[in-house]
């Protein structure tokens, strides 16, 4: 009567059904491609390399040698609140990000590593504009970008073996406000979505 679909033992369906049931919503503040992934389970034709900067950036990375394959080894998915909190605490525990001088290249490497190993589409690590502290748009990500004090910069630039291409020596060339920024962990960001309060206009389509 119902044809082949009436059989409850359709191959793989119980697993897929369970995955759908457990799927978490995308975190507030992720980009358009991740919102697509949440709603449709895939990136649709409304987000292509021609129309979406994050998709174009990701496509360009496939041409570059970044030290690991760009194609994720796990299913593609949007960053969730829980995943952002867990990732923040994992990085805090392992060390290496706290106090690291921010540069776009370093952020790209982090985004690609997370995309490759965890499958999270790299449009979630965005911050409020400057000057001053930049708060994460994605709720659950507990790292903000904080301007480095001038004394600390001076100290870091002393000595003959300072690399001119090191982010601390570039004097904020990556930043529209010309500020040198560092990643700083703040556990309160897991409970307080500062970016949404400061810039509600960024969240109209969420």
Swiss-Prot record:
Short sequence motif Dileucine internalization motif: positions: 164-165
GO molecular function term, any single one: signaling receptor binding
Subcellular location as annotated: Host cell membrane; Virion; Secreted; Host Golgi apparatus membrane
Keywords for the protein's UniProt record, in alphabetical order: AIDS, Apoptosis, Early protein, Host cell membrane, Host Golgi apparatus, Host membrane, Host-virus interaction, Inhibition of host adaptive immune response by virus, Inhibition of host autophagy by virus, Inhibition of host MHC class I molecule presentation by virus, Inhibition of host MHC class II molecule presentation by virus, Lipoprotein, Membrane, Myristate, Phosphoprotein, Secreted, SH3-binding, Viral immunoevasion, Virion, Virulence
Span list, region Acidic: 62-65
Record PTM text: The virion-associated Nef proteins are cleaved by the viral protease to release the soluble C-terminal core protein. Nef is probably cleaved concomitantly with viral structural proteins on maturation of virus particles.
UniProt-annotated stretches for the region SH3-binding: 69-78
Region (Binding to ATP6V1H): 148-180
Membrane topology (UniProt): Lipid-anchor
Keyword Membrane in record: yes
Gene3D superfamilies: HIV 1 nef anchor domain, Nef Regulatory Factor
Record motif PxxP, residues: 72-75
Annotated site (Might play a role in AP-1 recruitment to the Nef-MHC-I complex): 20
Miscellaneous information on this protein: HIV-1 lineages are divided in three main groups, M (for Major), O (for Outlier), and N (for New, or Non-M, Non-O). The vast majority of strains found worldwide belong to the group M. Group O seems to be endemic to and largely confined to Cameroon and neighboring countries in West Central Africa, where these viruses represent a small minority of HIV-1 strains. The group N is represented by a limited number of isolates from Cameroonian persons. The group M is further subdivided in 9 clades or subtypes (A to D, F to H, J and K).
Summary of subunit composition and partner proteins: Monomer; cytosolic form. Homodimer; membrane bound form. Interacts with Nef associated p21-activated kinase (PAK2); this interaction activates PAK2. Associates with the Nef-MHC-I-AP1 complex; this complex is required for MHC-I internalization. Interacts (via C-terminus) with host PI3-kinase. Interacts with host PACS1; this interaction seems to be weak. Interacts with host PACS2. Interacts with host LCK and MAPK3; these interactions inhibit the kinase activity of the latter. Interacts with host ATP6V1H; this interaction may play a role in CD4 endocytosis.
Domain notes: The N-terminal domain is composed of the N-myristoyl glycine and of a cluster of positively charged amino acids. It is required for inner plasma membrane targeting of Nef and virion incorporation, and thereby for infectivity. This domain is also involved in binding to TP53. The SH3-binding domain constituted of PxxP motifs mediates binding to several Src family proteins thereby regulating their tyrosine kinase activity. The same motifs also mediates the association with MAPK3, PI3-kinase and TCR-zeta.
The name this protein goes by in its record: Protein Nef
Species name: Human immunodeficiency virus type 1 group M subtype B (isolate LW123) (HIV-1)
């Amino acid at each position: 009567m119902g044809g082949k679909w009436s059989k409850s033992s359709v191959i793989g369906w119980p697993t897929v059904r369970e995955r759908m049931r457990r799927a978490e919503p995308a975190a507030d503040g992720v980009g358009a491609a991740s919102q697509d992934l949440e709603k449709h389970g895939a990136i649709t034709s409304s987000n292509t390399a021609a129309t979406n900067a994050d998709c174009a950036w990701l496509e360009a990375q496939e041409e570059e040698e970044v030290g690991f394959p760009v194609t994720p080894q796990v299913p593609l998915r949007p960053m969730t609140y829980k995943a952002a909190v867990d990732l923040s605490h994992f990085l805090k525990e392992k060390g290496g990000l706290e106090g690291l001088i921010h540069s776009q290249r370093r952020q790209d490497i982090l985004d690609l590593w997370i995309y490759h190993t965890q499958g999270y589409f790299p449009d979630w690590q965005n911050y409020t504009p400057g000057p001053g502290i930049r708060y994460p748009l994605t709720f659950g990500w507990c790292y903000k970008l904080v301007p480095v004090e001038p004394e600390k910069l001076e100290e870091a630039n002393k000595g003959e073996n300072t690399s001119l291409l090191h982010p601390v020596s570039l004097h904020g060339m990556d930043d529209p406000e010309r500020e040198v920024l560092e990643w700083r962990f703040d556990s309160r960001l897991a409970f307080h979505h500062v970016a949404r309060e400061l810039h509600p206009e960024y969240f109209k389509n969420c």
